UniProtKB/Swiss-Prot annotation:
Keywords: Cytoplasm, Exonuclease, Hydrolase, Nuclease
EC assignment: 3.1.11.6
The UniProt record lists the keyword Transport: no
NCBIfam families tied to this protein: PRK00977.1-3 (NF002139), PRK00977.1-4 (NF002140), xseB (TIGR01280)
Catalytic activity: Exonucleolytic cleavage in either 5'- to 3'- or 3'- to 5'-direction to yield nucleoside 5'-phosphates
Any Gene Ontology CC annotation: cytosol
Protein's name in the database: Exodeoxyribonuclease 7 small subunit
Entry function: Bidirectionally degrades single-stranded DNA into large acid-insoluble oligonucleotides, which are then degraded further into small acid-soluble oligonucleotides.
Organism lineage: Bacteria, Pseudomonadati, Pseudomonadota, Alphaproteobacteria, Rickettsiales
GO biological process: DNA catabolic process
Subunit structure as annotated in this protein's UniProt entry: Heterooligomer composed of large and small subunits.
Organism for this UniProt entry: Rickettsia rickettsii (strain Sheila Smith)
Length: 80
């Protein structure tokens, strides 16, 4: 786990989500020192933002595909 201010550009949604889940478990279980927990929290925020970005990109791509396939705009509310 890297605690840099940026996230690796090539990390997949699934990898980011898995790491985020692991961070949440460690923080919830109190398995880390305060300093490590704060660093993990910071990393978790980066991972959350990355996952949200990937989901938004996927939603936009689906909307574009739907528009092209039907030649009409079909926007449906998607739950995240």
């Amino acid at each position: 786990m890297t605690n840099t201010k940026t996230l690796e550009a090539n990390i997949s949604f699934e990898e980011a989500l898995k790491e985020l889940e692991e961070i949440v478990k460690k923080i919830d279980n109190g398995q880390e020192s305060l300093e490590t927990a704060v660093n993990s929290f910071e990393r978790g925020i980066l991972l959350k933002n990355h996952c949200e970005k990937k989901l938004k990109e996927a939603r936009l791509k689906i909307e574009k595909i739907t528009k092209l396939a039907d030649s009409t705009v079909v926007l449906e509310e998607m739950e995240v």
